[in-house]
């Protein structure tokens, strides 16, 4: 009986950790994707600011952007998909 409870606890923990996003750097409480702004709008806004976009993907419910910013730095930035508000940036 004890090993069954332990097994269940391990599965529950793994499910929670797995849903936190691949990197865990940022999470966005973004709701269903039907309410998100398009990736193309984000790309356009960042390009107009002088960014060179390399890749955009979804991670932790956020748009995760790999780019060269307007200062020439390689960055990994997260944006809320509903508001397109900047969440965080890390230099690469």
Where are these regions (language model features)?
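Cleaved targeting-peptide boundary
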Residues: 20-30
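Glycine-centered tight beta-turn/hairpin loop motif at sheet-sheet or coil-to-beta transitions
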Residues: 70-72
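Classic N-terminal secretory signal peptides
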Residues: 1-22
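Short, solvent-exposed mixed-charge patches
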Residues: 90-92
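Conserved histidines in hydrophobic membrane contexts and catalytic metal-binding motifs
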Residues: 65-68, 79
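A short, surface-exposed beta-strand/turn
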Residues: 75-87
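Short, non-transmembrane alpha-helical segments in secretory-pathway proteins
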Residues: 29-52
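Surface-exposed aromatic
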Residues: 60-64
């Amino acid at each position: 009986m004890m090993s069954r409870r332990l097994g269940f606890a391990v599965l529950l923990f793994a499910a929670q950790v797995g849903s936190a996003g691949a990197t865990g750097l940022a999470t966005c409480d973004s709701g269903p994707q039907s309410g998100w702004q398009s990736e193309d709008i984000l790309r356009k806004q960042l390009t107009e600011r002088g960014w060179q976009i390399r890749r955009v993907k979804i991670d932790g419910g956020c748009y995760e952007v790999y780019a060269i910013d307007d200062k020439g730095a390689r960055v990994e930035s997260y944006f809320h998909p509903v508001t397109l508000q900047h969440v965080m940036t890390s230099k690469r």
